[in-house]
């Protein structure tokens, strides 16, 4: 792979669709390899805009606007970092040879909503999943819940960071769940998934990398499993490695290899799985770095963003774990623009602790504004350090 010089005729140009905190780290990883990066998001001054060579603000669900921007910028690679994108336009762009979509336009199209990827995993590949039903109305949702049996989980087919997701323990809670799901949907606000609840011991993210081997063939590699805690579907903390039985780990890798192999292309995938003993169920997959994978900024020789950057460029990767670690989310706590952070010095005083403050221009009480990272002799010890550090950082309005 030949890499050029940014802002010159030889530039290797990559366009990121989505410039949040994950996209920002991908941009930094690409720039360290001499790549020219164009960051696109729906609002000004997104985290990735602040570090990219060029920034654009468009409605990425507008296929015509998206195609026009890609035609103007002429990137070698288009790298989606969010779900809310006009994926049909990406399919057309790939077919026309205007740019290569990472990992593939088909993979982005299938994973943009929960219906596409669930049907692929459960119905095409025959992978174990929770029982489920897709519904289009409140009446269908109630009927599906009765058929599956309470409790159930209700989600929009398209949302992120737990938005619109809730657990429903009985029929009396269904109306509130329906209203919340309708508000939480990002693009297709009229379709939902109802899932039966699995009795699992823990859930993991298995970061799975499809990258070129020395032979030129695509091979699949795995990072150490990441355990995580979610509240209402939103990541709160993660740690690596998550202890698993050898049988469960082997099965998790088989499932991850099957689904990412079917999606194809190059890059890093975040495969979410439920585990009980030696039994593993597929949950979801994202064809991009995963929020729970931010722990790898502290734990791995190459973090998930560096792995993604290398893989999409056709470069060698190293998924090795360096030391145990954990991450804990720092929330906005207030609704305000241009907030400041107190307590940063106290948070960083503990050995093995680091912070990432994302630079989002506007805070909300439950918006993820940063993350505390920690390493220690064990994941449990690192979790304590990360949570303590996150608690010391206080967002304040100014």
UniProtKB/Swiss-Prot annotation:
Query: Which keywords does UniProt give here?
Result: ATP-binding, Ligase, Magnesium, Metal-binding, Nucleotide-binding, Purine biosynthesis
- Which residues take part in binding Mg(2+)? 272, 284
**Biological process, per Gene Ontology:** 'de novo' IMP biosynthetic process
- Catalysed reactions, semicolon-separated: N(1)-(5-phospho-beta-D-ribosyl)glycinamide + formate + ATP = N(2)-formyl-N(1)-(5-phospho-beta-D-ribosyl)glycinamide + ADP + phosphate + H(+)
Q: Gene3D superfamilies in the record, alphabetically?
A: 3.40.50.20, ATP-grasp fold, A domain, ATP-grasp fold, B domain
Task: Give the residues the record marks as binding ATP.
Answer: 114, 155, 160-165, 195-198, 203
Q: Which GO terms describe its cellular component?
A: cytosol
Gene Ontology MF, one: ATP binding
Q: Per its database record, what is this protein's job?
A: Involved in the de novo purine biosynthesis. Catalyzes the transfer of formate to 5-phospho-ribosyl-glycinamide (GAR), producing 5-phospho-ribosyl-N-formylglycinamide (FGAR). Formate is provided by PurU via hydrolysis of 10-formyl-tetrahydrofolate.
Family, per entry: Belongs to the PurK/PurT family.
Q: What is this protein called?
A: Formate-dependent phosphoribosylglycinamide formyltransferase
């Amino acid at each position: 792979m030949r890499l050029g010089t940014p802002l010159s005729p030889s530039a290797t140009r990559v366009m990121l669709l989505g410039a949040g905190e994950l996209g920002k780290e991908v941009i930094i990883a690409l720039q360290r390899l001499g790549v020219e990066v164009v960051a696109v998001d729906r609002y000004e001054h997104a985290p990735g805009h602040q570090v990219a060579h060029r920034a654009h603000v468009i409605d990425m669900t507008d296929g015509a606007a998206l195609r026009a921007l890609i035609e103007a910028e002429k990137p070698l690679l288009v790298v989606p970092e969010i779900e809310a994108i006009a994926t049909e336009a990406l399919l057309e762009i790939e077919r026309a040879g205007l740019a290569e979509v990472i990992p593939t336009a088909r993979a982005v199209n299938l994973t943009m909503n929960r219906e596409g990827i669930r049907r692929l995993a459960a119905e095409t590949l025959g992978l174990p999943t929770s029982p489920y039903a897709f519904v289009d109305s409140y009446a269908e949702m109630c009927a599906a819940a009765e058929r599956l049996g309470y409790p159930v989980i209700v989600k929009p087919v398209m949302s992120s960071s737990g938005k619109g997701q809730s657990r429903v323990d009985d029929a009396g809670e269904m109306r509130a769940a329906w209203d919340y799901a309708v508000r939480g949907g990002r693009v297709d606000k009229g379709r939902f998934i109802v899932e039966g609840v699995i009795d699992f011991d823990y859930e993991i993210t298995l970061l799975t990398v499809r990258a070129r081997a020395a032979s030129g063939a695509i091979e699949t590699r795995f990072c150490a499993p990441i355990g995580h805690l979610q509240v209402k579907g939103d990541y709160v903390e993660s740690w690596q490695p998550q202890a698993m039985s050898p049988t469960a780990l082997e099965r998790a890798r088989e499932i991850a290899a099957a689904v990412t192999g079917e999606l194809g292309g190059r890059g890093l995938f975040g495969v979410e799985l439920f585990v009980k003993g030696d039994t593993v169920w597929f949950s979801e997959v994202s064809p991009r770095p995963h929020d729970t994978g931010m722990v790898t900024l502290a734990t791995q020789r190459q973090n998930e963003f560096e792995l993604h950057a290398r893989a999409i460029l056709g470069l060698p990767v190293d998924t090795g774990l360096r030391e145990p670690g954990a991450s804990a989310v720092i929330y906005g706590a207030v609704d305000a623009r241009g907030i400041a952070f107190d307590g940063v010095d106290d948070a960083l005083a503990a050995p093995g602790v680091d912070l990432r403050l994302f630079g989002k221009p506007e805070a909300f009480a439950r918006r993820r504004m940063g993350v505390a990272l920690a390493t220690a002799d064990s994941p449990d010890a690192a979790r304590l350090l990360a949570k303590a550090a996150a608690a010391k950082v206080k967002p304040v309005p100014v």
